[in-house]
Amino acid sequence: MKKASVVGTTCILTYVVNYYLRHILSVLTPALLLTGNFTIEHIANLSSTYMLLYAVGQLVNGFLGDIFSPKYMISFGLLVSGAAIVLFPFIPWKLLQIVCFAFLGFGLSMLRGPLMKTISENTSPNHARLICVFFSFASFCGPLLASLFALINGWNFAFIAAGSVAVALSFVSYIILSVMERKGLISYMKTKVTGIASVLAVFKIENIFFYLVVACIVEISAASISQWLTTFLTVSLGFSKETANMIYSGISVIRSFMPFVSLAVFRAIKERDIPMMRVTFSIAAIMFALLIVSSDKWMSILFLSIALMAMSCTSALLWSIYIPSLGKTGRVSSVNGVIDCIGYIAAAGANLLFANVMSNVGWNTVYILWSLIGVIGLVTTFVFNQRKVQR
């Protein structure tokens, strides 16, 4: 239990910083737009560059994470991403700003796979599942901290503070993981198969294709929709950027408890994940669709919050239930990398689509697209179940 506590605490703290960095652009978008130096299109380019490099990096670093010691990848990833964010406020050139977010994406892609590998291969299945629930909780604490920093301080300070903490944590995490390795508290399974065979082996793992589709849906929700949340609050609903950040913080707090709700419901319904996903996808589709007819901004916030809560429950089933169950395969980092890569490629494409639609068509069409994401998820669960029956 002591080992699980140390492993869990180290990984969770690292993941909070990870998600602070991942969502900092989203919460600071209204402030950046007010400067007059940033446009929606340029911010979309920044976020999509980050997403694409994160996706590619997840694929590459996911497999490397099953070969090399996670402590090197975790510490180096924090160092690179932190340095990129510290430099960003001081760079006036758009192309170099995009380069900063490219380094941010690739640096952060070095974290999740090795972190999941550390948890899954060094704790019992029950402990791993519980730690990963807190892992998901941490993924919402990061955006919450980012929004609070944005509310209290200027956008420049928020970037510098986030990057500085990441750089400092890169050294702290390396020291902690090194000490635990020397004491024999943690060890890692190294894959013996490399190259194309290693890639193909991932696709032989049970249910991988179904969860690849789920990953696309939850990452579009977590990354693409969340990216434009504060913009939705300021531009579509007319809130000030300060109020928008407060609302964003409130939504993040509520969503942070969804992993615990998911685990409790999952156990209560005897670990039947597919029926649970059908409910969450249905709720999300309906709530997003209600935004089209809503004329009250507070009701719109309620509908959006419920939709995002439902998607967060689905996300928890993927990251807190399915991934930790693969510890004995020795390919946790690889599977995580493939799933996150595909998910973020989908999110990057959706991000550009949403930006184009909201600029040239209107928000109602954006709501329709968001609702369709839930519909696609619902249909996928029935297709997957039908194939299981046929087999």
In which residue ranges do the predicted regions lie?
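A late C-terminal transmembrane helix in Major Facilitator Superfamily
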Residues: 326-361
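Helix-loop-helix hairpin linking two adjacent transmembrane segments in secondary transporters
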Residues: 134-181
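Juxtamembrane intracellular "pre-TM" segments in multi-pass secondary transporters
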Residues: 181-211
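C-terminal transmembrane helical hairpin of 12-TM major facilitator-type secondary transporters
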Residues: 272-318
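Extracytoplasmic gate region of multi-pass secondary transporters
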Residues: 25-27, 206-259
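Conserved MFS/SLC helix-loop-helix module at the cytosolic interface between two early adjacent transmembrane helices
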Residues: 56-95
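Helix-to-loop junctions at the C-terminal end of transmembrane segments
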Residues: 58-69, 259-271, 358
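Cytoplasmic helix-loop-helix junction between adjacent transmembrane helices
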Residues: 100-137
